[in-house]
Amino acid sequence: MKYKKKEKEELKKILTEEEYYVTQENGTERPFTNEYWDFNGEGIYVDITTGEPLFTSKDKFHSSCGWPAFSKPIDRSIIKEKVDKSHGMVRTEVRSKLGDSHLGHVFCDGPEELGGLRYCINSASLKFIPKEELKEKGYEEYLELFK
């Protein structure tokens, strides 16, 4: 599957206001009220703007942060990290590599047994693809993650 970055004008047409705000304006959605914070489906999470595979449900864990939390991305090469000094804090921002979408932040307070990282990701930046639909939606290569 080939992924493509969309122009801002196209994104404004296809994304909700919140999805656009989060992914294109570095926004943050409200905790504990977003779509995936307590979701437990089996599958992968992709960038809502490009379809790039980002995270798998196998690496998702329950955290008290109010947003979906993952121990690692599917592949580190598909994300980029940068220093974020907004809101009087110093954090590490996580963005999708191709789409350059703001996803959330990564922290070093994740479960030690999972590597110690917590990728705290906005649901509004993600689209969930259920395991049962991976083949039909062009993500067949990721089925092996669930064997």
Curated annotation (Swiss-Prot):
Write down any Gene Ontology CC term: cytoplasm
A Pfam match: SelR
E.C. number, please?
1.8.4.12
What Gene3D superfamilies does the annotation carry?
A: Peptide methionine sulfoxide reductase
**Catalysed reactions, as listed in the record:** L-methionyl-[protein] + [thioredoxin]-disulfide + H2O = L-methionyl-(R)-S-oxide-[protein] + [thioredoxin]-dithiol
MsrB domain location is 8-131
Q: Which GO terms describe its biological process?
A: protein repair; response to oxidative stress
Q: According to its UniProt record, which protein family does this protein belong to?
A: Belongs to the MsrB Met sulfoxide reductase family.
Protein name, entry field: Peptide methionine sulfoxide reductase MsrB
State the organism named in the record. Clostridium perfringens (strain SM101 / Type A)
What gene codes for this chain? msrB
